[in-house]
Amino acid sequence: MTIHLISFASILHKQVSLRSSHEAILSEIEKYYTVKFVDHQDMDKLSSDDFKIIFVATGGVERLVIQHFENLPRPAILLADGMQNSVAAALEISTWLRGRGMKSEILHGELSAIILRIHTLYNNFQAQRSLFGKRIGVIGSPSSWLVASNVDYLLAKRRWGIEYVDIPLERIYEQFKHNTDDQVGASCAAVASQALACREGTPEDLIKSMRLYRAIKKVCQEENLEALTLSCFKLIEQIDTTGCVALSLLNDDGIIAGCEGDLQSVFTLLAVKALTGKDGFMANPSMINSRTNELILAHCTVGLKQTERYIIRNHFETEKGIAIQGLLPTGDVTIIKCGGECLDEYYLSTGTLTENTNYINMCRTQVRIHMNTPAEYFLKNPLGNHHIMLHGNYEDTLNEFFQANACKRTE
């Protein structure tokens, strides 16, 4: 892990070396990172993949910094340890930058706190850069009922660097035809043998589901997709199977896969994975109790690796094909959803997964969540239907990231 320190020092202080004047802070940073000093005149030689901090080494550099405004890293992270009047200069610089719409932050104080903050900023930077250039396949088209889940492809690319790629379902149908039952026999046996039970569905249904999985994965490889969202209900009309098993296994393979052509939710899944390394469970808030502050999240697919055990079921709405009833571990969870046509809004909360439910009138994988914030959000100010649940409390990590990217938090 490398930090590029862009150094600004007054000519009045050049007789004192940067290293000796700031030994304490530099030695501490070097315990965790490789530090490369970059003269401010050379900062334009750095690439967008380089993590940069502006090192305010002395006072008297205020005008020098603003003269290089166009080349400064964004956001502007100013390191000032207090030596050589550096804090005084950093205060002036930060105020000037923020007055011109640039996010700015001063790193100063206890060494341990500075290091923790650098860790957070570095992880945010790495996550943001990892999103850049990612291709999200939109296989088919968004479901007609997702009227509030649109994304403007161009605005999303400008903000996040991601690319939504439209792929016709005919590509999947063609690959599906080429896959034979014999090719998927072993995979079907593996999924069936590890299931806790099989309540509905036939061997033929499972074979079709596995052929679909192979077809989608092949297209993902051909299109170099990091993620996809599938128009799964239209599949049922054409090939008489659901996408539940395919999406489950694709997520286990590391290909982020969402349902119903939901453009906002698949980005949420991708961003969450970039920041935390965790896969999410995309689900419908199916029951909401604002008095007890509980909700039930439900959907017919979940990554098998997210479950403790799973049961093979059929699809709830159509009673066709194969769905997954995952039994998920109890404990702390995070609920998140990115919204807005340019993905500049988000909802974020935490809670406790208290039980796996088994209602007959909702999707197969069901979990009850006791929320740490008012569940009234879902009734009064929701960001659409689908929300993402991941195991663990990642509120601070996710909030820091979206705030740093000028997103508006909805509560």
Show which residues each predicted segment covers:
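N-terminal basic/disordered segments at the start of proteins
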Residues: 1-39
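Hydrophobic beta-strand segments of well-ordered beta-sheets in folded domains
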Residues: 1-8, 50-54, 73-80, 102-104, ...
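Structural motif
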Residues: 6-17, 40, 55-59, 81-82, ...
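An N-terminal, globular interaction/scaffold subdomain
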Residues: 26-93
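Flexible loop/turn segments at secondary-structure boundaries
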Residues: 62, 86, 144-146, 234-239, ...
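C-terminal catalytic subdomain
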Residues: 255-355
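Extended hydrophobic packing segments that form well-structured cores
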Residues: 323-411
